[in-house]
Structures are given as structure tokens and as C-alpha cells.
UniProtKB/Swiss-Prot annotation:
It is found in: Secreted. Belongs to the RNase T2 family. It comes from Magallana gigas. It holds the Pfam family Ribonuclease_T2. Glycans are attached at N52, N121, N142. It is an enzyme of class 3 (hydrolase). The active site is at H35, E89, H93. Gene3D superfamilies: Ribonuclease T2-like. This is Ribonuclease Oy. CDD domains: RNase_T2_euk. InterPro entries: Ribonuclease_T2_eukaryotic, RNase_T2-like, RNase_T2-like_sf, RNase_T2_His_AS_1, RNase_T2_His_AS_2. One of its GO terms (molecular function) is RNA binding. Its main location: secreted.
């Protein structure tokens, strides 16, 4: 399957946990975490997946990155194997990116994710625009989309999730940016941008990761 750009998705730990009963956010995780770096196609409904079943994830190949991966690409589900999130992302998406020199193996692929997280840090982008985690303040999707565009110059895809257990509120869940195969920023697909899962007419919430912050 052909693909022509990357989607780089970062997620807010509190909202990830609103979706999953067994969830734990380690003290070392204080901001937006990486969800994944996904080869994507603007002609297909989504990009290629599971491109090489004979290349399983091997933690030994990313050992130098593990301390950073735990902090910035964390698995928040204690009922799963420690490396299962990275295994899943590699098998489903990473194996589809190996044709590019910059992401041709596990070390390069996960290293690129960490590089992009440092360069396009969502916590920093939102803080620069006055959007801060808060127990009480709500934010509107239009303002948030415009804020991200002011920072990056391109349209991002912003997603929310409904927290039916605790707060009964819409929570900011994920922000995805799109990049060329040369890792230059581009606007994401207009259809995906407009079909946000965040409510258009009411605010969503962005609660802090650790209560003491």
C-alpha cells in the first residue's frame, strides 16, 4: 500500500486513562506522550499497517532510548507487558516506514518519534498560546485549533474523549500533526481536521496530569 505522509500523534495521559479502567501514570510522565508515528495516505482512508510480520520488535535494538521512551512514549496500562505498546506501534506502523533511511529500523524509528516530540512538544505549543492544564477552565475547539495553527503554521487534528466514569466531561485527548516523508510540517487532511471528536459548541477540559502540579 502506498503512503505519502506521516501522522505524528501525541496524547494527554489523563484522557488516555479516562478510556481504560486499569491505568497508571508514573511520576516521570508529566506531559504529552507519544501515541505514534504513522505512515499515512491521503488517498486511502488510512495508511498501510502491519507491513512485515517477519520483523518483530526487539527491545535490545532500542536499549539506548528506553529511559526516554518510558518518559515520553509511555505505556500507561499496568495490565499489559511493559514493552507491549512499543511492540504494537512497531508492528503496526514502524514496519511500514522502513523504506525511508530516517526510519529504516527500530532504533531510527523510535528515535525519530522522540526527536519530533522534542521539536513539536504539544505542552509547550499550548502554553505559548495560554492554554494550560486546569481543574476548572474549559477550552473551545475553535480557539485551540487556531492556537496550534498560530504556533505551527499548519492545521492539526485535535481529538477529545468523553470521561464517563469520573468527570462526565469531554477531555482533550490527542493532537496529531502531519509531516512529509522529509519530516517537514504540512497541514493535515481537511476532512480529518473538520471531523474532530471534540464538541464544537461546548468546552472541553484539560486537567493536570498529577494533582500536585
Amino acid at each position: 500500500k502506498d503512503w505519502n505522509y506521516f501522522t505524528f500523534a501525541q496524547q494527554w495521559p489523563i484522557a488516555v486513562c479516562a478510556e481504560h479502567k486499569s491505568c497508571f501514570i508514573p511520576d516521570s510522565v508529566v506531559g504529552w506522550g507519544i501515541h505514534g508515528l504513522w505512515p499515512s495516505s491521503d488517498t486511502e482512508s488510512k495508511g498501510p499497517e502491519n507491513c512485515n510480520g517477519s520483523w518483530p520488535f526487539d527491545i535490545n535494538n532500542v536499549m539506548p532510548l528506553v529511559p526516554e521512551l518510558k518518559k515520553y512514549w509511555p505505556n500507561l496500562y499496568p495490565d499489559t507487558k511493559a514493552n507491549s505498546f512499543w511492540e504494537h506501534e512497531w508492528s503496526k506502523h514502524g514496519t511500514c516506514a522502513t523504506s525511508l533511511p530516517a526510519t529504516s529500523n527500530e532504533l531510527k524509528y523510535f528515535g525519530m518519534g522522540l526527536k519530533l516530540h522534542a521539536k513539536y512538544n504539544i505542552s509547550r505549543i499550548l502554553v505559548n498560546q495560554g492554554i494550560l492544564p486546569s481543574k476548572t477552565a474549559g477550552y473551545m475547539i475553535n480557539e485551540t485549533e487556531a492556537a496550534v495553527k498560530r504556533e505551527l503554521g499548519v492545521d492539526a487534528v485535535i481529538e477529545c474523549v468523553y470521561d464517563k466514569e469520573k468527570t462526565k466531561k469531554q477531555l482533550l485527548y490527542e493532537i496529531s500533526i502531519c509531516l512529509t516523508k522529509e519530516f517537514e510540517l504540512i497541514s493535515c487532511n481537511k476532512k480529518e481536521v473538520s471531523e474532530t471528536t471534540c464538541p464544537r459548541k461546548e468546552p472541553f477540559f484539560y486537567p493536570p496530569v498529577h494533582d500536585n502540579n
